[in-house]
Amino acid sequence: MNRDHFYTLNIAEIAERIGNDDCAYQVLMAFINENGEAQMLNKTAVAEMIQLSKPTVFATVNSFYCAGYIDETRVGRSKIYTLSDLGVEIVECFKQKAMEMRNL
C-alpha cells in the first residue's frame, strides 16, 4: 500500500468519526461559510453560530487545534481560528460522502 493511499484512508476514517459526533461535526462545519469557503472565527462566534455551550465548543476547538484540523492566529489579545489544510481535506470528505448519498 503506498503512502498516499494510506493517508487517504486515514482522512476518510477521521471524517467518518467526526461525522458521527454531532458536536464535532457542527464545530468543524462552522468554519465553512454559505459559499463553501473557509472562514475565520473566534470561539465565541462558533458557539453562537451553532448554539452550543461555550465550554463544549471551546474544548472542541482546542482539540481540533491540537489535532491540526484548524489553525490559530493571534489578533491582538484575541485568537482567531480557521480550517487548516487537513481540516479542509476532512470537509472535502464530507462533501464527497454527501454526493455519494445523493447518487444512491
UniProtKB/Swiss-Prot annotation:
Residues 43-50, 54-65 bind DNA. A miniplasmid containing this and downstream gene tubZ is able to replicate in B.thuringiensis subsp. israelensis and express insect toxin proteins. The miniplasmid could be used to make plasmids for insect toxin overexpression. Induction: Probably part of the tubR-tubZ operon. Changing R74A: No DNA binding. Coiled coil: none annotated. One of its GO terms (molecular function) is identical protein binding. Although this has the same function as TubR of B.cereus strain ATCC 10987 there is little sequence homology and the dimerization interface is different. Homodimer. Binds to tubC DNA, the TubR-DNA complex binds to TubZ. This is DNA-binding transcriptional repressor TubR. It comes from Bacillus thuringiensis subsp. israelensis. The gene is tubR.
